Amino acid sequence: MNIIKPLTCILAMSISGLATAAVTLHVPDDVTLFVANGQKAKLSGSLFASSKTIELPNGENQIVFQYEPYFSQGNDRIGVESNVIIAKFSANDTDLNFELPKYRDHRVAEQEIKQMQWQLVDEQGAAVTKSEDKLVKSGMQIGRDYAREAADYNQTGGIAAIGTAVSVATIKTEPVADVETKVKAGDNTAEEMLHFWYDKADEATKARFKAYINQ
């Protein structure tokens, strides 16, 4: 059996599903999002918008951010910085917003912001379960490479750490029903890809794939 046809089918269905399945994180202007899932965060939105957004995949995500509310004092604006926070959370097909503390003035903020309590809330106002930690760097804090620091943190296995990407060769696959197991040597790569995408697909996609190859 030519395995390329079902491979193309499941690949197309998987990509189609991924294209419409995402988490939208809204980032207010007093939050600096440094890193999302190991990469420098790329936000969408106009320059002067009160908040911007970033699209994240369904499932587990990790972010690195800092909260810096501003306060007016005479003609000056005073910013008070939180710790740099690394956090992981899981969500699917939803919009998320930061829920952050509000302080009466900069003096109160300076006293309390290092121990701030914050949440990510979904469209129904429910808090998303998260794990957080401080992303600490000793010495001078100028010119920090947050993506590198997040990668190093993940290697330590901290409470907000996420696993590194798994290679195709190490993924445990389940056999596809009714697919011939004997293939020519030249089809090995295609078979591995087929197993990979099948294992990544949701149950609905798997069902459509089985129906397709049984035609």
From Swiss-Prot:
Family to which this protein belongs: Belongs to the UPF0319 family.
Protein name listed in UniProt: UPF0319 protein VVA1446
Signal peptide range in chain numbering: 1-21
Signal among keywords: yes
InterPro entries: UPF0319 (IPR018635)
UniProtKB keywords: Signal
